[in-house]
Amino acid sequence: MTILTFQNVKHILAASLLSLGLVACDKGTQFTEKTDDNTQTKSSIEQIKKNGVVRIGVFSDKPPFGYLDAQGKNQGFDVEIAKHVAKDLLGDENKVEFVLTEAANRVEYLKANKVDIIFANFTVTPERKEVVDFAKPYLKVALGVVSPKSHPITDVAQLKDKTLLVNKGTTADSFFTKTHPEIKLQKYEQNTETFDALKDGRGAALAHDNLLVLAWAKENPNYTVGITNLGEQDLIAPAVKKGDKELLDWLNQDLEKLAKEGVIHQAYEKTLKPVYGDTINPKDLLVE
Protein backbone atom coordinates (compact mmCIF):
# COMPACT_ATOMS: atom_id res chain seq x y z
CA MET A 1 0.00 0.00 0.00
CA THR A 2 1.23 3.48 -0.85
CA ILE A 3 1.21 5.99 1.99
CA LEU A 4 -0.46 9.10 0.65
CA THR A 5 0.62 12.51 1.88
CA PHE A 6 -1.41 15.56 2.83
CA GLN A 7 0.07 17.35 -0.18
CA ASN A 8 -1.87 15.38 -2.79
CA VAL A 9 -4.80 13.86 -0.92
CA LYS A 10 -6.91 16.97 -1.45
CA HIS A 11 -6.72 16.63 -5.24
CA ILE A 12 -7.96 13.05 -5.13
CA LEU A 13 -10.66 14.04 -2.66
CA ALA A 14 -12.07 16.69 -4.97
CA ALA A 15 -12.46 14.19 -7.80
CA SER A 16 -13.99 11.45 -5.65
CA LEU A 17 -16.17 13.21 -3.09
CA LEU A 18 -19.26 13.65 -5.24
CA SER A 19 -19.44 10.04 -6.35
CA LEU A 20 -18.54 8.52 -2.98
CA GLY A 21 -19.77 10.97 -0.38
CA LEU A 22 -23.43 10.79 -1.27
CA VAL A 23 -23.47 7.05 -1.89
CA ALA A 24 -25.62 6.28 1.12
CA CYS A 25 -28.52 8.60 0.37
CA ASP A 26 -30.84 5.95 -1.04
CA LYS A 27 -29.75 2.89 0.94
CA GLY A 28 -30.76 3.67 4.51
CA THR A 29 -30.79 0.72 6.88
CA GLN A 30 -34.35 0.37 8.06
CA PHE A 31 -35.01 -0.25 11.73
CA THR A 32 -38.79 -0.37 11.28
CA GLU A 33 -41.22 -1.45 8.59
CA LYS A 34 -44.97 -1.14 8.11
CA THR A 35 -47.05 -4.33 8.02
CA ASP A 36 -50.86 -4.12 8.16
CA ASP A 37 -50.59 -0.68 9.76
CA ASN A 38 -48.52 -2.11 12.61
CA THR A 39 -44.92 -1.00 13.02
CA GLN A 40 -42.56 -3.93 13.59
CA THR A 41 -38.95 -3.68 14.62
CA LYS A 42 -36.56 -5.08 12.04
CA SER A 43 -33.09 -6.33 12.84
CA SER A 44 -30.40 -3.92 11.65
CA ILE A 45 -28.03 -6.82 11.02
CA GLU A 46 -30.74 -8.61 9.06
CA GLN A 47 -31.20 -5.49 6.93
CA ILE A 48 -27.45 -5.16 6.34
CA LYS A 49 -27.30 -8.76 5.18
CA LYS A 50 -30.33 -8.20 2.97
CA ASN A 51 -28.59 -5.18 1.41
CA GLY A 52 -25.49 -7.30 0.89
CA VAL A 53 -23.23 -4.48 2.03
CA VAL A 54 -22.34 -2.69 5.25
CA ARG A 55 -22.06 1.10 4.98
CA ILE A 56 -19.15 2.43 7.01
CA GLY A 57 -18.39 6.12 7.43
CA VAL A 58 -14.70 6.99 7.07
CA PHE A 59 -12.54 10.05 6.53
CA SER A 60 -11.21 10.90 3.09
CA ASP A 61 -8.50 13.38 4.09
CA LYS A 62 -6.96 12.20 7.35
CA PRO A 63 -3.90 10.09 6.53
CA PRO A 64 -2.78 7.70 7.87
CA PHE A 65 -6.16 6.89 9.42
CA GLY A 66 -8.63 7.40 6.60
CA TYR A 67 -7.88 8.81 3.14
CA LEU A 68 -8.16 8.24 -0.61
CA ASP A 69 -5.07 6.97 -2.40
CA ALA A 70 -3.90 7.91 -5.90
CA GLN A 71 -6.44 5.49 -7.40
CA GLY A 72 -9.29 6.92 -5.33
CA LYS A 73 -9.41 3.87 -3.05
CA ASN A 74 -9.99 4.11 0.68
CA GLN A 75 -6.88 3.45 2.75
CA GLY A 76 -5.70 3.89 6.32
CA PHE A 77 -5.78 2.39 9.79
CA ASP A 78 -9.54 2.82 10.29
CA VAL A 79 -10.20 1.40 6.83
CA GLU A 80 -8.13 -1.73 7.48
CA ILE A 81 -10.11 -2.57 10.60
CA ALA A 82 -13.40 -1.74 8.88
CA LYS A 83 -12.63 -4.23 6.11
CA HIS A 84 -12.18 -6.99 8.67
CA VAL A 85 -15.48 -6.04 10.28
CA ALA A 86 -17.19 -6.33 6.89
CA LYS A 87 -15.59 -9.73 6.31
CA ASP A 88 -16.77 -11.05 9.67
CA LEU A 89 -20.27 -9.67 9.16
CA LEU A 90 -20.85 -10.56 5.50
CA GLY A 91 -18.09 -13.04 4.67
CA ASP A 92 -16.23 -10.74 2.28
CA GLU A 93 -14.16 -7.64 3.06
CA ASN A 94 -15.25 -6.17 -0.27
CA LYS A 95 -18.88 -6.08 0.85
CA VAL A 96 -18.35 -2.68 2.40
CA GLU A 97 -19.52 0.65 1.09
CA PHE A 98 -17.26 3.40 2.39
CA VAL A 99 -19.15 6.64 2.90
CA LEU A 100 -16.98 9.74 3.12
CA THR A 101 -17.71 11.94 6.12
CA GLU A 102 -16.38 15.04 7.83
CA ALA A 103 -15.94 15.30 11.59
CA ALA A 104 -19.05 17.45 11.99
CA ASN A 105 -21.22 14.98 10.03
CA ARG A 106 -20.47 11.76 11.90
CA VAL A 107 -23.36 11.93 14.34
CA GLU A 108 -25.83 13.14 11.72
CA TYR A 109 -24.89 10.34 9.31
CA LEU A 110 -25.75 7.77 11.98
CA LYS A 111 -28.98 9.51 12.93
CA ALA A 112 -30.09 9.80 9.30
CA ASN A 113 -29.25 6.14 8.50
CA LYS A 114 -26.68 7.17 5.90
CA VAL A 115 -24.20 4.76 7.49
CA ASP A 116 -24.42 1.66 9.66
CA ILE A 117 -21.12 2.18 11.47
CA ILE A 118 -18.69 5.08 11.85
CA PHE A 119 -14.97 4.28 11.68
CA ALA A 120 -13.69 7.85 11.41
CA ASN A 121 -11.24 8.50 14.24
CA PHE A 122 -14.22 9.12 16.53
CA THR A 123 -13.11 10.26 19.99
CA VAL A 124 -15.38 9.09 22.81
CA THR A 125 -16.80 12.01 24.82
CA PRO A 126 -19.71 12.27 27.29
CA GLU A 127 -21.58 14.58 24.91
CA ARG A 128 -21.26 12.18 21.99
CA LYS A 129 -22.27 9.19 24.12
CA GLU A 130 -25.63 10.88 24.57
CA VAL A 131 -26.37 10.77 20.84
CA VAL A 132 -24.54 7.67 19.53
CA ASP A 133 -23.50 4.30 20.94
CA PHE A 134 -19.75 3.72 21.00
CA ALA A 135 -18.27 0.25 20.68
CA LYS A 136 -15.03 -0.89 22.29
CA PRO A 137 -12.15 1.56 21.72
CA TYR A 138 -9.11 0.66 19.63
CA LEU A 139 -6.90 3.78 19.91
CA LYS A 140 -5.68 6.23 22.54
CA VAL A 141 -5.33 9.90 21.66
CA ALA A 142 -4.79 13.37 23.11
CA LEU A 143 -4.63 16.82 21.53
CA GLY A 144 -1.58 18.32 19.88
CA VAL A 145 -0.77 21.80 18.59
CA VAL A 146 1.36 22.34 15.49
CA SER A 147 2.85 25.70 14.49
CA PRO A 148 5.61 27.16 12.29
CA LYS A 149 9.14 26.48 13.53
CA SER A 150 9.83 30.18 13.10
CA HIS A 151 7.15 31.04 15.66
CA PRO A 152 6.63 27.89 17.73
CA ILE A 153 3.72 27.56 20.13
CA THR A 154 4.88 25.53 23.12
CA ASP A 155 2.32 26.66 25.68
CA VAL A 156 -1.39 27.37 25.41
CA ALA A 157 -0.83 30.74 27.09
CA GLN A 158 0.97 31.89 23.93
CA LEU A 159 -2.30 31.61 22.00
CA LYS A 160 -4.10 34.33 23.95
CA ASP A 161 -5.63 36.85 21.52
CA LYS A 162 -4.28 34.80 18.61
CA THR A 163 -6.15 32.71 16.03
CA LEU A 164 -6.11 28.95 16.43
CA LEU A 165 -7.20 26.74 13.54
CA VAL A 166 -9.46 23.76 14.26
CA ASN A 167 -11.91 21.46 12.51
CA LYS A 168 -15.61 21.81 13.26
CA GLY A 169 -17.01 19.11 15.50
CA THR A 170 -13.65 17.80 16.69
CA THR A 171 -12.37 17.29 20.21
CA ALA A 172 -10.02 20.24 19.67
CA ASP A 173 -12.98 22.46 18.78
CA SER A 174 -14.84 21.42 21.93
CA PHE A 175 -11.81 21.64 24.23
CA PHE A 176 -10.75 25.16 23.27
CA THR A 177 -14.33 26.46 23.08
CA LYS A 178 -15.00 25.33 26.65
CA THR A 179 -11.68 25.94 28.36
CA HIS A 180 -10.02 28.80 26.48
CA PRO A 181 -12.53 31.46 25.40
CA GLU A 182 -9.66 33.95 25.18
CA ILE A 183 -8.40 32.16 22.06
CA LYS A 184 -10.04 33.00 18.74
CA LEU A 185 -10.99 29.86 16.81
CA GLN A 186 -11.11 29.70 13.03
CA LYS A 187 -13.04 26.56 12.06
CA TYR A 188 -13.02 24.49 8.88
CA GLU A 189 -14.89 21.42 7.64
CA GLN A 190 -12.08 19.45 6.00
CA ASN A 191 -8.64 18.62 7.34
CA THR A 192 -7.00 19.74 4.10
CA GLU A 193 -8.64 23.18 4.45
CA THR A 194 -7.36 23.56 7.99
CA PHE A 195 -3.78 22.62 7.19
CA ASP A 196 -3.81 24.85 4.11
CA ALA A 197 -4.94 27.70 6.37
CA LEU A 198 -1.94 27.10 8.62
CA LYS A 199 0.41 27.19 5.63
CA ASP A 200 -1.23 30.41 4.43
CA GLY A 201 -0.66 32.06 7.80
CA ARG A 202 -4.33 32.41 8.69
CA GLY A 203 -3.64 31.25 12.22
CA ALA A 204 -0.81 31.08 14.72
CA ALA A 205 -1.23 27.35 15.16
CA LEU A 206 -3.47 24.37 14.47
CA ALA A 207 -4.95 22.02 17.08
CA HIS A 208 -6.06 18.48 16.30
CA ASP A 209 -5.47 14.91 17.45
CA ASN A 210 -1.81 14.61 18.39
CA LEU A 211 -1.35 11.56 16.16
CA LEU A 212 -2.52 13.53 13.14
CA VAL A 213 -0.39 16.64 13.71
CA LEU A 214 2.70 14.54 14.46
CA ALA A 215 2.26 12.75 11.12
CA TRP A 216 1.69 16.03 9.28
CA ALA A 217 4.73 17.71 10.83
CA LYS A 218 6.95 14.84 9.64
CA GLU A 219 5.87 15.67 6.09
CA ASN A 220 6.27 19.41 6.64
CA PRO A 221 9.67 20.08 8.25
CA ASN A 222 9.06 23.82 8.58
CA TYR A 223 6.46 23.08 11.26
CA THR A 224 6.75 21.63 14.73
CA VAL A 225 4.38 20.07 17.26
CA GLY A 226 5.26 22.28 20.21
CA ILE A 227 2.46 20.85 22.36
CA THR A 228 2.32 17.07 21.98
CA ASN A 229 -0.06 16.04 24.75
CA LEU A 230 -2.83 18.44 25.71
CA GLY A 231 -5.89 17.68 27.80
CA GLU A 232 -6.88 14.26 29.03
CA GLN A 233 -6.00 11.14 27.11
CA ASP A 234 -9.08 10.05 25.21
CA LEU A 235 -10.18 6.90 23.45
CA ILE A 236 -11.16 6.43 19.82
CA ALA A 237 -13.89 3.94 18.97
CA PRO A 238 -16.35 3.04 16.22
CA ALA A 239 -19.97 4.04 16.75
CA VAL A 240 -23.46 2.93 15.74
CA LYS A 241 -26.84 4.61 15.83
CA LYS A 242 -28.13 5.27 19.34
CA GLY A 243 -30.22 2.34 20.54
CA ASP A 244 -29.00 -0.21 17.99
CA LYS A 245 -28.00 -2.69 20.69
CA GLU A 246 -27.91 -5.68 18.36
CA LEU A 247 -25.30 -4.18 16.04
CA LEU A 248 -23.40 -2.69 18.99
CA ASP A 249 -23.16 -6.05 20.78
CA TRP A 250 -22.03 -7.80 17.60
CA LEU A 251 -19.43 -5.11 16.90
CA ASN A 252 -18.04 -5.32 20.44
CA GLN A 253 -17.62 -9.07 20.14
CA ASP A 254 -15.96 -8.73 16.75
CA LEU A 255 -13.52 -6.04 17.90
CA GLU A 256 -12.53 -8.24 20.84
CA LYS A 257 -11.94 -11.13 18.44
CA LEU A 258 -9.91 -8.97 16.05
CA ALA A 259 -7.72 -7.75 18.91
CA LYS A 260 -7.04 -11.32 20.08
CA GLU A 261 -6.20 -12.36 16.52
CA GLY A 262 -3.67 -9.54 16.24
CA VAL A 263 -5.57 -7.79 13.45
CA ILE A 264 -5.44 -4.37 15.10
CA HIS A 265 -1.68 -4.64 15.59
CA GLN A 266 -1.29 -5.78 11.98
CA ALA A 267 -3.23 -2.71 10.86
CA TYR A 268 -0.82 -0.58 12.89
CA GLU A 269 2.21 -2.22 11.26
CA LYS A 270 0.76 -1.68 7.80
CA THR A 271 -0.54 1.87 8.06
CA LEU A 272 0.85 3.72 11.10
CA LYS A 273 4.35 2.40 11.70
CA PRO A 274 5.57 3.53 8.24
CA VAL A 275 4.56 7.06 9.27
CA TYR A 276 5.60 7.23 12.93
CA GLY A 277 8.52 4.80 12.90
CA ASP A 278 9.95 4.43 16.39
CA THR A 279 8.69 7.81 17.62
CA ILE A 280 5.56 6.20 19.08
CA ASN A 281 5.38 2.98 21.09
CA PRO A 282 2.39 0.98 19.81
CA LYS A 283 1.54 0.10 23.41
CA ASP A 284 0.94 3.81 24.04
CA LEU A 285 -1.35 4.01 21.03
CA LEU A 286 -3.32 0.78 20.62
CA VAL A 287 -6.09 -0.63 22.79
CA GLU A 288 -5.72 -4.37 22.36
Predicted segments — roles?
Residues 26-34, 80, 84, 88, ...:
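Extended ligand-binding regions for polar small-molecule ligands
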Residues 60, 139-147, 210, 214-255, ...:
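Periplasmic-binding protein-like
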Residues 21-24:
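C-terminal motif of bacterial Sec signal peptides marking the signal peptidase cleavage site
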